């Protein structure tokens, strides 16, 4: 039984280059170091929607963010692992045995971050995965609902297309599962470990949803315009925000056995 974590980096950041199970992923010209994976260009089927609006490949990758790593893993699924994990830039999941799982967030300087990824942590992770189908960071309790929180800052068009995509593409999710968006608890930041077969299903559904949005939205790469009634300064970042909400929905709708562990924020 083996596991591998694939952090997504868009800027250089130190990490444990001797870890056997952490393989940082990067695109473009970011230099990460040894034991990392450079994601070659494999995005033509998705980039076509951006290209039609004159968006450069560089801007596409900036908009895509961590989804580039998830897409790469979906298309190049490693056969040597049973559990697949993804984390976003400067964030990690805590598997240090000496740190209680009920901790919320741990701020860690770079001098400590380079020590993460030990064999002892891997053993702890695999032990957790024997009893759970997914691991995420600890959930956030919102003042309002998941839906309200999103719509307070983001353009609404992509949110409603997200809902419609779930209903049109995946009828096995009944209407009651959509009530999760009215709840107030969500594992923000899209950091997780899945059993491999569940990762493949999660990623496959996510990219079907994104493509549905691309095919039906008014603009694939929106920019902030005078008079827009949302506060988000970079609305083209919606793929990551949709992915963040879909993770929580996917876990809840499929009634997965979940363990929450502390989030490590790398300073």
Question: Language-model segments: what does each one mean?
Answer:
Residues 1-267:
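ER/Golgi luminal nucleotide-sugar-dependent glycosyltransferases, focusing on the catalytic module
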